[in-house]
Amino acid sequence: MGILNSISTPADLKALNDEDLDALAKEIRTFLVDKVAATGGHLGPNLGVVELTIGLHRVFDSPQDPIIFDTSHQSYVHKILTGRAKDFDSLRQKDGLSGYTCRAESEHDWTESSHASAALSYADGLSKAKQLDGDTTHSVVAVVGDGALTGGMCWEALNNIAAGKDRKVVVVVNDNGRSYSPTIGGFAENLAGLRMQPFYDRFMEKGKTSLKSMGWVGERTFEALHAFKEGVKSTVIPTEMFPELGMKYVGPVDGHNQKAVDNALKYAHDYDGPIIVHMVTEKGRGYAPAEQDLDELMHSTGVIDPLTGAPKSASKPGWTSVFSDELVKIGAQNENVVAITAAMAGPTGLSKFEANFPNRFFDVGIAEQHAVTSAAGLALGGKHPVVAIYSTFLNRAFDQLLMDVGMLNQPVTLVLDRSGVTGSDGASHNGVWDMALTSIVPGVQVAAPRDEDSLRELLNEAISIDDGPTVVRFPKGDLPTPIVAIDTLEDGVDVLAYEDATDVESTDDAPSVLIIAVGERATVALDVASRIKQHGVNVTVVDPRWIVPIPQSLVALSDDHDLVITIEDGVIHGGVGSLLSDALNASEVDTPRRQIAVPQKYLDHASRNEVLADYGLDADGIETTVVGWLDSLFGE
């Protein structure tokens, strides 16, 4: 790691020669494999942007020239080159480096949301701020993947960026989708190089003016030459990806040729106006196990063997795999069931459905808003769409759920993977807002399964509902031990336990506590119940299964107990506890009620168990909180 050890700031890159740069790129790839193999993370994307990121920091002066990484899962090399290499052993660990850009870590990090398609809007706003401050020298750079360009927000931003002819916005498209070739013959290479020569712009503008001043003949000549140029351009530039926005375009550029990368970025740096630089890169570059992973190119990994790329521990069947299997079974029985993903068929478990029913599967790209409204259209056409997305990405499509699905009472089922606390992926990947958001949609029904069997049951129930939208939410990770209900009430609420108080003369005289456990929180609720009964209270534990709207039996049960506690994995405002409190108030039930939920804040990254413990949401923390309530309410 000779060259890498000498890099502590981006300025250290500027004096390196070609040989040093090649050596540095190799060292960075070795470093990435070694460190990410030990912690897990986004390996493939970062292996693909080594030369690109080196070039960005050689040409631009960060942070004076802001560099914004869309999604920012591909910012590891950026972190290495901005003085954080020494901290990579803590990547995605508690109190360690974030897996995304993080403003608290470095002045070189401008944003920290890991949601796609937002970088160009940030860049548009930053460039406007610089213009208002009279700064005409510095550029704003946005690095966006070809996948993110399937998001409508990118094109909204590009439309505004293109309108700012005197704003220095550099849009670097990191095209690793293998859709376009970086080299299309020698003529294409020469044309791409020609377009980056300063005299080319002057010549084209002067020639255009001269020809048009020659009257009819000049006009026809210009049109013919322009048509020829555009015809040639269309063989080089993927015009279906980059429509005529009125912005300067450079590329395609071989994103692994350092000299070509630097030249293109230098041209963009010196260009007075918005410009698109199209870099073609290879995800997983330089690491054989990633290059051979044709499906994912090691986009994201857990802890792996750095030599083979094999996981260090075998993964257990999780929530997603159960959903995947059950949906295929449902699809085989009901040909009107269709599935929609927003560019995440594998992570959300829809690949198996796609393999079995390719004509009933739709990948809409990174476009959650479109996914939900398209689902409404499918429902209007007599189908029952199942939209599988991560809980955190539902935030982007709330208006579509509220107005396009909910208002029309369409039978669309949203399956929200990674609900609740997700942990190491950081604040913006937690799925803690979905209950608060979905619960305000009139007519929506929301289910929260506690284990494998209830997930299968609730998914079937949701898809059988044909008069309005349904939501099924479940967390990330392994499945808990199955919990068998000891009783089921008329409205479907499962009773999981009756725990009699211990160390009391008569349980009839002991205060009674009702614990309402949401989804997989049933496991910890049963643990807590077995503990607090030793403090002289009788405990009933129930699982509502369908949490929105609040089942009427929960109101009756609350009226029959001396204290009601809700335990959930969403934010405290607007969740099940809030909904229950509203229902009790409406029925004039004055039983004291308390909530165990996620605080109203953005959670730092750590493992899921660490986050739960930090906020008192594990069994120990909940027991301590509940015992305090018992003492204040029933203590002598």
Curated annotation (Swiss-Prot):
Catalytic activity: D-glyceraldehyde 3-phosphate + pyruvate + H(+) = 1-deoxy-D-xylulose 5-phosphate + CO2
Cofactor binding remark: Binds 1 Mg(2+) ion per subunit. Binds 1 thiamine pyrophosphate per subunit.
Associated pathway: Metabolic intermediate biosynthesis; 1-deoxy-D-xylulose 5-phosphate biosynthesis; 1-deoxy-D-xylulose 5-phosphate from D-glyceraldehyde 3-phosphate and pyruvate: step 1/1
Enzyme class of the recorded protein, top EC level: transferase
GO cellular component: cytosol
SMART domains: Transket_pyr
Subunit composition and interactions: Homodimer.
Protein name as it appears in the record: 1-deoxy-D-xylulose-5-phosphate synthase
Lineage of the organism: Bacteria, Bacillati, Actinomycetota, Actinomycetes, Mycobacteriales
Gene symbol of the encoding locus: dxs
